[in-house]
């Protein structure tokens, strides 16, 4: 059967039949049906094949139907080919044994030779990490034999193996069409998807609920570096009952690894058509957020900031006097307050913003010129270098300088006075970031600096890319070419590591208190923002390509599917749609709103990339929907507040199963409040929403 440039055929082997997809005269890939099918009837589940008798193979109207049978099962496969070479398969298993089968696990396995597996992609879990010299997986969750996750744990239900060295079909992806395994009556059970080692092969595995972490079957990754027993994937199959599963196999050629993301994202849009329509208007959202900032603001003779927060007694809408501390997110909040007030032609928010920035810059100086303390302990009313102790993290410092640049640019744009103390402090910090000796030997920023300006933790670290944003904006503020020169040079170094080699992550540490080190999605967010800021300052199209490359990776963190939640969960009782929200990180399998929707939408407008525009709309609409209107959503009757994280998988912060698949965090930080506020304000002021 021909379809476009691709050709679908089959051929008999000794005891099976092979489905072959041809690309012109070249074989793109083939699937041995009997070797593909898997069945297990014991615990822990096995990856066993079974012998089958071939009953019939038919090819009618472009659809191949295969019927197989043995003493236990009859299986029918219906196979078709799309114009782009995508193989669509529906598999139906029927229990023909005459008795109930216990502890059943059904599925399929698509093998690739281990030497051909240059890179592996599992959305939000593993990115382009293949095999080590020992033959084990490099990725921390696959090491030991593999990783198989519930469909709902993956923002897009696919796994992918890349081999850029091989011509014609050098990337192969297995997509699952999400579905429940309906024979589990006591609880909802979905299919599962992952990558495992099978002898000399790396196999993409799709099974009816079994899970694996680090090669350990019947375990899920249930918390921060915690593998939790989970045996709910099994079911009993009465005689004559059927189980049906649909999936797709997609193969394409890519000249380089970065093209793998581009192709797999396009295919994901084709298969799942993600959307999240507007349910809260942008005007209402901005109104709710402005109320929240007004409620959070507090000042005294020697203090100013957006540090009030809801107490535990939500029902009386009481705000505590102070939260735990003043963080750099106060400067982001100050920009939001000022920008929104300028749009509304009101003075109050501008005055609050000015006082907040004045408080910070007048009281947070370090001995080392250019550096600043980043955290004010509200309990002791004293500054600390950071929440991590006597260090100044490069990620937070870069964000602080970048946020300061934003508010300086805003005031200049609207002809508002920028105090000399602001300009002096800002330029001192930017001058510090231009010092080569304050970088690592690779030419990027260290994980942190000591209070005297010394370089700490020289290991390669992604979070410092925020400093690039700060310098790019500094060029826009001052016109000083040194700032943009240093920024672009450092950005290229980050690009080589993060995008081309995918190697720049914080050193893996097995420890409980790992939350502050979860920088993978956020590192891409900050890289994309930095590349966008450099592009805006220079209009260099090479930098725009870096923006788009990061955007493609980031899109794989976004939920494309509105998976079912636990029946009695808090979120399931609401009209909750998880599409458009993105996973926090590889270690934190929860959803949040941290996503560069404005930069993605603008890049899509400039390049004409419809997928970028679509994804930006989906993500910003999802974030807007989370804001409380003051009517009690998410237990928050204060307008504009929102939950920080949402637990939509078998994972939670503390590995407590009662929050799994439908819970959410009760805390609501200033960071989450201001992130979505900033995105909508930027989109609104640019007239692209």
What are these regions (language model features)?
Residues 1-5:
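Intrinsically disordered, low-structural-confidence terminal and linker regions
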Residues 10, 57, 79, 374-383:
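Assembly/interface hotspot detector across virion components, adhesins/toxins, and nucleic-acid enzymes
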Residues 249-253:
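Short, charged beta-turn/beta-strand-edge "cap" motif at the junction between a beta-strand
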